[in-house]
């Protein structure tokens, strides 16, 4: 019985490790007082639509599933009548050891930037701030 309790305790710790938190941050760094429209979704959740003011940001945290298939898609819109837009994968995992951490997106005048925030040894493919997408007219 004692061995069973030890096994259950260790197994529980391993399971908590595999469902650790992750998140998305979307910041509005547009010029000329432009608002940023955003909507994100996964298989189970819909976030938004929300309007992010200049200099503002939207942050959400969530748990990744045990199968490591958690993925969020987002749409961002800006400009007159929100005619400039981009649809993209805002969060995904790259394997069993990847915990996801926070994917930090920044909407700027001509492009959208990403920085995957480093959260220790478990982050796979950490990146510095770099351009990922152009706006679609």
Swiss-Prot record:
Pfam families to which the protein is assigned, alphabetical: Self-incomp_S1
Domain of life from the UniProt record: Eukaryota
Subcellular location: Secreted
Principal subcellular localization: secreted
Keyword field contains Glycoprotein: yes
Annotated signal peptide: 1-21
GO BP terms, alphabetized: rejection of self pollen
Keyword Protein biosynthesis on entry: no
GO CC field: extracellular region
Keywords of this entry: Glycoprotein, Secreted, Self-incompatibility, Signal
Sites carrying sugar chains: 87
PANTHER family per record: PTHR31232, S-PROTEIN HOMOLOG-RELATED (PTHR31232:SF54)
Family, per entry: Belongs to the plant self-incompatibility (S1) protein family.
Protein name: S-protein homolog 16
Source organism (scientific name): Arabidopsis thaliana
